[in-house]
Amino acid sequence: MAHARHLFLFMVAFTITMVIARLDFNPTIINEDRGRTKIHVGLLAEWTTADGDQGTLGFPALGALPLAISLANQDSNILNGFDVQFEWVDTHCDINIGMHAVSDWWKRGFVGVIGPGCGCTYEGRLASALNIPMIDYVCDENPVSDKSIYPTFLRTIPPSIQVVEAIILTLQRYELDQVSVVVENITKYRNIFNTMKDKFDERDYEILHEEYYAGFDPWDYEMDDPFSEIIQRTKETTRIYVFFGDASDLRQFAMTALDEGILDSGDYVILGAVVDLEVRDSQDYHSLDYILDTSEYLNQINPDYARLFKNREYTRSDNDRALEALKSVIIVTGAPVLKTRNWDRFSTFVIDNALDAPFNGELELRAEIDFASVYMFDATMQLLEALDRTHAAGGDIYDGEEVVSTLLNSTYRSKTDTFYQFDENGDGVKPYVLLHLIPIPKGDGGATKDSLGMYPIGTFNRENGQWGFEEALDEDANVLKPVWHNRDEPPLDMPPCGFHGELCTNWALYLGASIPTFLIIFGGLIGFFIYRKRAYEAALDSLVWKVDWSEVQTKATDTNSQGFSMKNMVMSAISVISNAEKQQIFATIGTYRGTVCALHAVHKNHIDLTRAVRTELKIMRDMRHDNICPFIGACIDRPHISILMHYCAKGSLQDILENDDIKLDSMFLSSLIADLVKGIVYLHSSEIKSHGHLKSSNCVVDNRWVLQITDYGLNEFKKGQKQDVDLGDHAKLARQLWTSPEHLRQEGSMPTAGSPQGDIYSFAIILTELYSRQEPFHENEMDLADIIGRVKSGEVPPYRPILNAVNAAAPDCVLSAIRACWPEDPADRPNIMAVRTMLAPLQKGLKPNILDNMIAIMERYTNNLEELVDERTQELQKEKTKTEQLLHRMLPPSIASQLIKGIAVLPETFEMVSIFFSDIVGFTALSAASTPIQVVNLLNDLYTLFDAIISNYDVYKVETIGDAYMLVSGLPLRNGDRHAGQIASTAHHLLESVKGFIVPHKPEVFLKLRIGIHSGSCVAGVVGLTMPRYCLFGDTVNTASRMESNGLALRIHVSPWCKQVLDKLGGYELEDRGLVPMNGKGEIHTFWLLGQDPSYKITKVKPPPQKLTQEAIEIAANRVIPDDV
């Protein structure tokens, strides 16, 4: 009773609020323009079909557009100074008519189109091509959501696939992971279902059955019920049904389920998605009239419908059965519209406008408006408000993309008094509700008898791009829970023992004949196992492995907002070489709670802590062995998902083998091999079973020169991680040199954990590295791809590394072990215990502790350590100097200095700079008549000359692309108003110098340089890390480019803004060119720069030497400036 009373009070309060908020809704249709500028909007609608029948658009909906335009024309806050008018075209659902209308309206300067109303892909594509905004009100097609193809298309109607988000949130809320899906076999519902399947794959939901049915017609009494067979096929292995179909079909499916007897127990639930429900009255919404199938209700809509029942026995018991079935149904549908006085007035105005010109509709009965009217009204108002915002911001109301951009990711108040949205794709977004049958006792909320009603028990809303579910509350602020049929809790998606009892054991069969002693023993064992199980589960849930990223301190220099600083890049070589401990190159080093650790990044967006993952992490924590690198923990904080292993300061075995300064004698090698074998023995006997990626880089050496195996286990944790984008093709192939042929042939299906036999093969490859001190297959002299291909092919005899170097250095027992470990058939390889026996001669006479032997090695290193340090320090200083010089050439000196110091360079706005653009007129023709090497030599000579000239001015060369040359002055160091003079003098100097330039291979050709300069504001900053560039952004760059492209050969084209600064400086001679039309800028009054004050002397620059023949010099001496410049 409390629930129903709360809902009733909510409806009353909402109605009063809406009426007060909209009390002033009293539009008058206005046709006169009142002296304002006229703009036009086009309306496309399927009023009638080609045969003259009623179209898909409900009759009264047309009246919504003139109503919206009239309200906007009366509102001084919308397009003030404009008079909005419209034209409309009945498309008859003919694409050609719609596209012709759009083209015609575009030619006539219409500011937007509402429609097309029947299909939308072709008209939307055309509108996007013509850059005219189009907002549709009934289109439910998926392709139009692609903004790269339909940049000017929006729709106020939400696409039906949005209901999938509400369905998934419902399943999440009630912990339902397995469902069967029943789908009406039409395009709309198939699209929704396909979308749901994609979402299910992302969230590990399971679809037990997919069932399709042909449309069910409740009026066709001879038509067989299609649902009975579906339920018979699925009921034994299903508890939750998701239904996609019309509301009448949902009713019939629920009644069939009731007849089949599956709803009596309350173990089954039907989740229906009603996407076509157009509710106009909250009373209808709750009274089930849109679900219940009564002739009385149909008669209220249209008396003709009632005559359909004259030959059928139809009683109230059918509706009683439907109500009983609906107790096991929950429905996801759109939020309702409350029928209020404001809604009735809106309906009246829409209908009146539809009856009036230019539609001149005919109406036998007083029609009811539907959601198409709301969507059309909203579409029109949103178009006009977008035009108003664009105009107010100084934009171009005829630029469709600019207009549409003001609506993307915006929220507006719909005519339904509900807040709707446009998402980033331009699709309408509306709230959804979750309905359930709730009893309404007599006297509650004005009810005259006990009844049932469909009330929302939750709402679905989209905020910040994410859908969320909010449960309804009663008047005591308690969650309004569903009244599950014949049960207190939501039904399970699978019986506790599984659909066939496979998850439970019938202990009675085993214990029935047991004697008391056995019961006592068994009870004790059960208690023991329960204790162990609880202890194990407690260990799984303890999260002792979890690392808080805030407690991790990396040795990397403080990073900028992009994750890496330029200083890190420049000094990376320094940090590796100067580290006396020879840090592991391929891992980030850090400290966690005082322990130095190696951080291995896992390239995943998030980690799902499934049982398998937690089990892995517990196993890793329990791994303890001298030759297994200890696991410290794992961080799952985004974006720092990583695995922390103990840091071994001597680096990897691969690092040691590549370091020629470390001399490895037989005793040293024997100790390393013994450590590696002991580590593999422990790994193969543990729960991890195998490594899977064993290679020399995954064998690390600590300060005591003990070899430890790392990068093992955690296969579920790392499953699905993305490829390292920084890893090149060569590195990817090189990683496979240790992989056994059977795993190479498995390609993408290779188990992440590998196999023990695969580890034995990898061990053999490591042995060849140890005794050759070279990378695997180094003597084979083939490309990596060819080597891997031959290993994978399984040729006879198997393709393996050439052992010339190994034969000369390794003892016989090692050679025998290598050959025994790499046969093609994994079954022919020995296990690790047999390998240890084969290599036992290596340990003869050696102690397990290598420290005594290492003391002698370190003494030998001490003799040349000082000399080695001095030599490496000098090499380091040289490389550092080269790096800094290169960076100063790539970037402005002040910017390069900041980056070298590790200071992040933030983008900066410069209020006034001057930009220079130039190109060579006729360069394309000259290039076509030249060889590529001639073009390169020409540009090299020309730009060498230019670079020598600009070094005398306060300018910075931004870039050269082909024959284009770009300069800027006034940044990154501001120079007052001098920037315009610096650019102008540079331009004058370059123009004079090019007149004496000779094209080596075509000396008769006169290079015609065309220059444009402009002054204004821009933003500059460093872009990129691998090859950083100092780039300029802003309209000033575009305008400078337009000045160059609209100039003339051997002339300097100056913008009016640049002229103002030059006039302020004085000393520059300019000539008025007049108005020049420019693409995207309109007409601009521009000028020619003719010269400068003689006191501004041009610095003499010695032209760089050109390789010219005497004949070329003589030809060039007789050339003249062409008449056309």
From Swiss-Prot:
Highest taxon of the lineage: Eukaryota
Catalysed reactions listed for this entry: GTP = 3',5'-cyclic GMP + diphosphate
Keyword Acyltransferase recorded: no
InterPro entries attached to this UniProt entry: A/G_cyclase, A/G_cyclase_CS, ANF_lig-bd_rcpt, Cyclic_nucleotide_synthase, HNOB_dom_associated, Kinase-like_dom_sf, Nucleotide_cyclase, Peripla_BP_I
Location in the cell: Membrane
Main EC class the enzyme belongs to: lyase
Extracellular topological domain residue ranges: 22-510
Chief location: membrane
UniProt record similarity statement: Belongs to the adenylyl cyclase class-4/guanylyl cyclase family.
Stated role: Implicated as a cell-surface receptor on spermatozoa for 'speract' a chemotactic peptide, and on various other cells as a receptor for atrial natriuretic peptide.
Official protein name in the record: Speract receptor
Native species: Strongylocentrotus purpuratus (Purple sea urchin)
